[in-house]
Amino acid sequence: MGKALVIVESPAKAKTINKYLGSDYVVKSSVGHIRDLPTSGSAAKKSADSTSTKTAKKPKKDERGALVNRMGVDPWHNWEAHYEVLPGKEKVVSELKQLAEKADHIYLATDLDREGEAIAWHLREVIGGDDARYSRVVFNEITKNAIRQAFNKPGELNIDRVNAQQARRFMDRVVGYMVSPLLWKKIARGLSAGRVQSVAVRLVVEREREIKAFVPEEFWEVDASTTTPSGEALALQVTHQNDKPFRPVNKEQTQAAVSLLEKARYSVLEREDKPTTSKPGAPFITSTLQQAASTRLGFGVKKTMMMAQRLYEAGYITYMRTDSTNLSQDAVNMVRGYISDNFGKKYLPESPNQYASKENSQEAHEAIRPSDVNVMAESLKDMEADAQKLYQLIWRQFVACQMTPAKYDSTTLTVGAGDFRLKARGRILRFDGWTKVMPALRKGDEDRILPAVNKGDALTLVELTPAQHFTKPPARFSEASLVKELEKRGIGRPSTYASIISTIQDRGYVRVENRRFYAEKMGEIVTDRLEENFRELMNYDFTAQMENSLDQVANHEAEWKAVLDHFFSDFTQQLDKAEKDPEEGGMRPNQMVLTSIDCPTCGRKMGIRTASTGVFLGCSGYALPPKERCKTTINLVPENEVLNVLEGEDAETNALRAKRRCPKCGTAMDSYLIDPKRKLHVCGNNPTCDGYEIEEGEFRIKGYDGPIVECEKCGSEMHLKMGRFGKYMACTNEECKNTRKILRNGEVAPPKEDPVPLPELPCEKSDAYFVLRDGAAGVFLAANTFPKSRETRAPLVEELYRFRDRLPEKLRYLADAPQQDPEGNKTMVRFSRKTKQQYVSSEKDGKATGWSAFYVDGKWVEGKK
């Protein structure tokens, strides 16, 4: 009798499952997806593993045929798709096919969400054979008991869930491949659009505009320091004057109030004592885990999901992509037993705490929890420190969610002083309850003990402290709060949040600074154009409804191709109109805002333009016929608009107060340096609003305050410049093109040696040859055709020795390093980011041996890393 083949999608998951299955099973990994829609027009070849069984036809030589070839899916012919084995996965597929031929049965044990279902379906389609040979097994946690139960009751592939995943993929493909070329034509090359990503960018853009339109308003608060009859200190805040909320808007009003308060008599009007409770939060779902990891651990969404994936695959937590707060009965019994044994009965509620899941959540799924509550974070020796921290957070939330409420005695004191009312609030913890395992992030102002005073007691004024404040604009999104907003609006699902957050940053429409989102100007322009021409596509409710439609497909409540057809019909109508000229209702181009600045080359006026790389000045003569065209541009150096995280929550308000306001629409203006004598202030709503101002004076680029830098090649001074990739130092000698980077710490990068061509060393992945380059992370070999070929690798010491005479003097010591370790393994040059020094190490079969040598006091010394 042969063995059964079990296929999972990750090697780590395969390793864990293998521990629980006997010798009758062979567990192998597909290493993620094995096939997908083509990345180029190669779909025209229609590979043998296509989902279609029709005879391959020669593609028509028209635009539609070419588009279908590129997309790999044909929305005009019943959504016929052409899947291809992913590059590099041929060997994996071949091995799985060979194992499948020998296997008695094949178990598809990929993840339990739609993505996992789709991977399982692709595996079955590619491997082939009788469908009866395949079984689908799913489990919420990788434990011995869960694995045994899953294999005792295997099921079949859920084709509805597969179709829901395909429908999402096809819609995203259509939008990306059909709208992006329109953006290239109308706005700028290299732009892209996405069905969900563009809506997420809209959220960031709208928040950016709310912030720029916000005008901070001044207001004042007055605190009073008093003492009680027994001499205890009592801090109060003025809340009312003449029974109206106290909110003076300037210093004069505040001083008038202070004068009255200084003469008033203070007495306690009311003391209110009442018990309050604080209930624990629900166990984590994907979005709340991402938010808690951001707030408590400082993790980004991508890092959180990567750590959670590793914990799941190692068997330590349940599946991490879920929107259900449901807990299995076994899990509830387990944690209640743990609470009773370790904290006592007073921490255990009479009945389990229940939490409501949102509408459309997958109740069959569980919340994210530890597989075994008795396993502590410190015992996860095979996990990295960040994974242990995330596990501890999940463990704490799981245990806390089934504990009793925390109990407090809350006190409110109301004090009278003439026409004024003052208040003080305090809270005393009487029973810690769930906070014993999940402490609060920080104590609020109420978490203080108020002195024992009663109604009628007189207080003595010690000091009045007026403080100026300004109203704050809406807070910028963090990764976690953007996920929360997407979830609230029903956009995306647990399995897509992380990819949405990553994609909108990769596209260059937004950026993250100090863990907060900023909209790029091109992101604003693209959002405006898409909103004007694709209202449904950019509509929050429509996007949420489409998510619901996909849920219906997964639940066998809707036919997937009917959903796609309805979407495509509306979409193509909008696309056809958008492709027309603006006069006919088509998409507006990326217009220039003309200025009074003269072109230094031809004298025509320069205009404010926006490209993917940022805002710049371009000559209006660029629109002329080729022979008359002027291509002159002027780089604009943006003022440092990134907020200093150390400034705290007032940073955004302070930045807005410092900005100029557009004379036409009142929006905060963005400021740029044209040259050392001119600064350009551009309306934050540019190019929709053409407001701008030119300021003259003496200016310089912020970013380098060190000593004068001398060019190492010609001896001239180097000055700070701003380019498409940021700030750099450039030689002032026009004949010398030398430049040097500005490092993150603000220092000028040390001089780098010129590349050394090594035509004797051919590249493996192209016809190029290697050159030896000196970079920020030491020397490395790179293709001479960069960026066409991006092949790089570390140089072998024996290679450097071979070409020692070509190396600059500064690098020749590397050629003198040991060429082999004591075991005869070849050595290569590496760079330590910790010490900023180069060293050599050896490898065997692609893995580090642990041997290394370091250059110390003019000689090479062997030593362990």
Curated annotation (Swiss-Prot):
Cofactor requirements of the protein: Mn(2+); Ca(2+)
GO molecular function: DNA binding; DNA topoisomerase activity; DNA topoisomerase type I (single strand cut, ATP-independent) activity; RNA topoisomerase activity; zinc ion binding
Protein name: DNA topoisomerase 1
Organism: Escherichia coli (strain K12)
Region of interest: Interaction with DNA: 192-197
Catalytic site positions: Y319 (o-(5'-phospho-dna)-tyrosine intermediate)
Induction text: Transcription is increased specifically in response to 2,4,6-trinitrotoluene (TNT) and its indicator compounds 1,3-DNB, 2,4-DNT, and 2,6-DNT.
Task of the protein: Releases the supercoiling and torsional tension of DNA, which is introduced during the DNA replication and transcription, by transiently cleaving and rejoining one strand of the DNA duplex. Introduces a single-strand break via transesterification at a target site in duplex DNA. The scissile phosphodiester is attacked by the catalytic tyrosine of the enzyme, resulting in the formation of a DNA-(5'-phosphotyrosyl)-enzyme intermediate and the expulsion of a 3'-OH DNA strand. The free DNA strand then undergoes passage around the unbroken strand, thus removing DNA supercoils.
Family designation: Belongs to the type IA topoisomerase family.
Chain intervals annotated as zinc finger (C4-type): 599-630, 662-689, 711-736
Alphabetical list of InterPro entries matching this protein: TOP1_Znf, Topo_IA, Topo_IA_2, Topo_IA_AS, Topo_IA_cen, Topo_IA_cen_sub1, Topo_IA_cen_sub2, Topo_IA_cen_sub3
Source taxon at top rank: Bacteria
Biased composition (Low complexity): 39-54
